[in-house]
Curated annotation (Swiss-Prot):
This is UDP-N-acetylmuramoyl-L-alanyl-D-glutamate--2,6-diaminopimelate ligase. InterPro entries: Mur-like_cat_sf (IPR036565), Mur_ligase_C (IPR004101), Mur_ligase_C_dom_sf (IPR036615), Mur_ligase_cen (IPR013221), Mur_ligase_N (IPR000713), MurE/MurF_N (IPR035911), UDP-N-AcMur-Glu-dNH2Pim_ligase (IPR005761). It is found in: Cytoplasm. Transmembrane segments: none annotated. PANTHER family: MUR LIGASE FAMILY MEMBER, UDP-N-ACETYLMURAMOYL-L-ALANYL-D-GLUTAMATE--2,6-DIAMINOPIMELATE LIGASE MURE HOMOLOG, CHLOROPLASTIC. It catalyses: UDP-N-acetyl-alpha-D-muramoyl-L-alanyl-D-glutamate + meso-2,6-diaminopimelate + ATP = UDP-N-acetyl-alpha-D-muramoyl-L-alanyl-gamma-D-glutamyl-meso-2,6-diaminopimelate + ADP + phosphate + H(+). It comes from Escherichia coli O6:H1 (strain CFT073 / ATCC 700928 / UPEC). Pathway: Cell wall biogenesis; peptidoglycan biosynthesis. Pfam families: Mur_ligase, Mur_ligase_C, Mur_ligase_M.
Length: 495
């Protein structure tokens, strides 16, 4: 299918499709151009079939459209000389269509999918860094962005559309990548965005409350994550045995690799396993000793906190399962770098230690505070807020966690979006036994400044919620703002 021809593309589904040379594939009629294939899907908010006339006017070569309520599956029509092929369940088929269009890029690199509530970004970054240290040109796709390491381009969503994902992977293959670690969101799984990818390995980090505004309850959220293993080509399964959901899944996945730092592994019951035997936390990170099916070892990590030890062990187990030699992984482990905006430490002489993290769920905030406490000789401060137009139920939970685990809580704005900022703050305060305990300051930059300037030299200030983000959404505006830049300026260092 080197020439990207419509007939070849549709051969598995519509053998009598007409021959048309195709330039690009797009779901967006606004960018459709001469020679393109426009795919008209029915989405949650819009019916792409309404934009077929616009796409034709812009010179597309062909159209594939959802058949439901319009035509029979495989029906071929013509509009103004442009073939329109109707397929039923087009959203479900889209990943496979895009895979054929872009020459099945997941066949041409080692693709590792990482799913879970927290830890996806750090785990994918560690996987890509480690494989690159072992000589593989490596890439990442996810929350921070997509691209070869060192050339990552920011993106809007953790997992793009089915077409975007295949297009991005094809681009990475063209740039020489032989390894890619991809964050796989629950939305992406439910919406079939990675349905046709061939993962070499699939990693589960953990499951805790998030996205219930979309999934409704934890049962549906868990079911969405399980799709990676039940309905996809998942390859090697790497599962966090310290998570209750992970332990349930391990019972259903006898060939999976079990990973633990809390002694949730019985080597006699698990075929392949990796577990921490001793972890020593210190100012510059942690010393981790482990045992595994592949042998024992010790790693010096520059990452903060227990959950990052878990992320590192998951990455290590994944690479071992893929055949990377343990000796080579141990030799290169000390060169793994902390991830931008993920428990990222900023220090300066005479100033408090400031940690910037993406924690924006109750579980992540608790773990971030526990991690920061391990490195804190004085008071532990926590600056945080909650996003507007999102799950309101987590707000009081996060307030309670800040009150329990921080010495000083500063409650501020996150991305208020179209909600009233003070109303969000009040929801957070409702979870505290003593609402007067918290300092309240709506302006985020002002709140961060207040905490950093008032904290003492041996204090630690955790600035949670935005991590790597360089914007704040207020109303419908996307304003320039970065916790990292704000903190660096206050400490007189470079972000």
């Amino acid at each position: 299918m080197a020439d990207r021809n419509l007939r070849d593309l549709l051969a598995p589904w519509v053998p009598d499709a007409p021959s048309r040379a195709l330039r690009e594939m797009t779901l967006d009629s606004r960018v459709a151009a001469a020679g393109d294939l426009f795919v008209a899907v029915v989405g949650h908010q819009a019916d792409g079939r309404r934009y077929i006339p616009q796409a034709i006017a812009q010179g597309v070569a062909a159209i594939i459209a959802e058949a439901k309520d319009e035509a029979t599956d495989g029906e071929i029509r013509e509009m103004h000389g442009v073939p329109v092929i109707y397929l039923s369940q087009l959203n479900e088929r889209l990943s496979a269509l895009a895979g054929r269009f872009y020459h099945e890029p997941s066949d041409n690199l080692r693709l590792v999918g990482v799913t879970g509530t927290n830890g996806k970004t750090t785990t994918t970054q560690l996987l890509a860094q480690w494989s690159q240290l072992l000589g593989e040109p490596s890439a990442v796709m996810g929350t921070v962005g997509n691209g070869l390491l060192g050339k990552v381009i920011p993106t809007e969503n953790t997992t793009g559309s089915a077409v975007d994902v295949q297009h991005e992977l094809a681009g990475l293959v063209d740039q020489g990548a032989t390894f890619c670690a991809m964050e796989v969101s629950s939305h992406g799984l439910v919406q079939h965005r990675v349905a046709a990818l061939k993962f070499a390995a699939s990693v589960f980090t953990n499951l805790s409350r998030d996205h219930l505004d979309y999934h409704g309850d934890m049962e549906h959220y868990e079911a969405a994550k399980w799709l990676l293993y039940s309905a996809h080509h998942c390859g090697q399964a790497i599962i966090n045995a310290d998570d209750e959901v992970g332990r349930r899944w391990l019972a259903k996945l006898p060939d999976a690799v079990a990973v633990s730092m809390e002694d949730h592994i019985n080597p006699n019951c698990h075929g392949r396993w990796l577990k921490a035997t001793d972890v020593n936390y210190h100012d510059s990170g942690a010393t981790i000793r482990f045992s595994s099916s592949w042998g024992d070892g010790e790693i010096e990590s520059r990452l903060m906190g227990a959950f990052n030890v878990s992320n590192l062990l998951l990455a290590l187990a994944t690479l071992l399962a893929l055949g990377y030699p343990l000796a080579d992984l141990l030799k290169t482990a000390a060169r793994l770098q902390p991830v931008c905006g993920r428990m990222e430490v900023f220090t300066a002489p005479g100033k408090p230690t400031v940690v910037v993290d993406y924690a924006h769920t109750p579980d992540a905030l608790e773990k971030a505070l526990q991690a920061a406490r391990l490195h804190c000789a004085g008071k532990l401060w926590c600056v945080f807020g909650c996003g507007g137009d999102r799950d309101k139920g987590k707000r009081p939970l996060m307030g309670a966690i800040a009150e329990e685990f921080a010495d000083v809580a500063v409650v501020t704005d996150d991305n208020p979006r179209t909600e009233e900022p003070r109303a969000i703050i009040n929801d957070i305060l409702a979870g505290m036994l003593d609402a007067g305990y918290a300092k309240v300051m709506e302006g985020r930059a002002e709140a961060v400044t207040c905490a950093v300037m008032q904290a003492k030299e041996n204090d630690v200030v955790l600035v949670a919620g935005k991590g790597h983000e360089d914007y704040q959404i207020v109303g419908n505006q996307r304003l320039d703002y970065s916790d990292r830049v704000t903190v660096a300026r206050l400490l007189g260092v470079i972000a």
